[in-house]
């Protein structure tokens, strides 16, 4: 009977998890209409030390403009980038090592401007002597070439854009790319050859047209903003949050990002400077960005203002190098403390076997091995409970409907026979958090995107295209159920639920990532093997 109760407990916990997950999605506000506008960020968002001549954020940070016909194209080993010489904005990015479709040739495009989506990374100089303004327009930069390419044997590539103001001040905006990396150093060098001091302030922001995340009950994903300050290590700030309230946070360092499934774009200003983290929503565009410190540049002097922009996969190692908290955009949910070691163990096994499917199998064997002492105690407790059934039936006949006396007598019997009636539940309770944590690891880790296993399983991060694994998983549950006969004391409703449980689980798992179904299937097969071994030992001790 304990086995049946355990399976029912699995079902209850599993369904509860799915319902809780769907409730979270349902409670989230729907995206606002594209035409909705918000008031500008007030001038108070500028740090107190700033001059009153600095315009407010909405006028200082220019609106998006149509890209120039002649874009500057940059090729590295990882990126294809297009830069608009008007303003020097990054208006297109293709990730050459990540394909749009499995086994396809086209790269995954993150930043782009099309009829369906507007997603760019904008940066500029504002302030009294800034060269970017929604009133005066953007700086028109000159470039020595319309195409740059990282050559073989070359580790870095610099793309300089120059602009000379009517005062004779030279502004050089440089994009520095590094082999093997997705982060771009975006620097401004201001050579003040005028006879007056200059005041400029760098900003960087990410603009994204409002659209709904392509999410489902079994594959929930997030599309929206996120930020970090010295008080808040990581917080999502959705399009709806931006519509409700503009961000206005002062911080030392920090970062802002736009997230989607597996990929991220982020501005990371200098960690030693005081920055303003802001957001706004206007004309159907969600904006999240930063404004740096106000820089005074004396006549005849030169100054460099630095920042970093990342556009690529949610690679935890690469992100943590840019900022200690940027890797948190790989969001494993409330069980992150369990998911992180699972991810690291999965990476370790993959480094050995070179296949993510076999790495998942090794994770399963490890978990089942660690839980084996508890599993053995579980089956031992179940065997003792079965042997107690005649005595329990006798107590039920003796006390009839007196539940209080019946309960007391049962507890005394359990104590006398050294049986824990809940002993069979602990392994199940421990497995569920591991299952949920692995679920988020498979869902969030870009390493699993388009990761093949064998035969027909060519992508472990999505559902089995032929539903073979879920069906095998259902069969394994049915076998486990048959190995443990129904207790005669079970009521008809429990019997019906038990009979339908493998079918219900199979239906649920049809849309789960194949890697997760593989984990559960292998876990069931190991459990069947362990059950046979443990029962053989119990029979020798007279327990059946």
Curated annotation (Swiss-Prot):
InterPro entries: Membr_insert_YidC, Membr_insert_YidC_N, YidC/ALB3/OXA1/COX18, YidC/Oxa/ALB_C, YidC_ALB_C, YidC_periplasmic_sf
Gene Ontology terms, MF aspect: membrane insertase activity
Residues passing through the membrane, by range: 6-26, 345-365, 423-443, 460-480, 503-523
Region (Disordered): 34-58
Record-annotated disulphide pairs: none
Keywords tagged on the record: Cell inner membrane, Cell membrane, Chaperone, Membrane, Protein transport, Transmembrane, Transmembrane helix, Transport
CDD domains: 5TM_YidC_Alb3, EcYidC-like_peri
Gene3D superfamilies recorded: 2.70.98.90
The UniProt record lists the keyword Transferase: no
Compositional bias ranges of the Polar residues kind: 39-49
Compartments where found: Cell inner membrane
UniProt topology in membrane: Multi-pass membrane protein
Gene Ontology CC annotations of this record: plasma membrane
Main location: membrane
GO biological process: protein insertion into membrane; protein transport
Taxonomic superkingdom: Bacteria
Record-stated family: Belongs to the OXA1/ALB3/YidC family. Type 1 subfamily.
Subunit-structure text: Interacts with the Sec translocase complex via SecD. Specifically interacts with transmembrane segments of nascent integral membrane proteins during membrane integration.
Job of this protein: Required for the insertion and/or proper folding and/or complex formation of integral membrane proteins into the membrane. Involved in integration of membrane proteins that insert both dependently and independently of the Sec translocase complex, as well as at least some lipoproteins. Aids folding of multispanning membrane proteins.
PANTHER family per record: CYTOCHROME C OXIDASE ASSEMBLY PROTEIN COX18, MITOCHONDRIAL, OXA1
Name this protein carries in UniProt: Membrane protein insertase YidC
Organism this protein belongs to: Shewanella halifaxensis (strain HAW-EB4)
Gene from which this protein is expressed: yidC
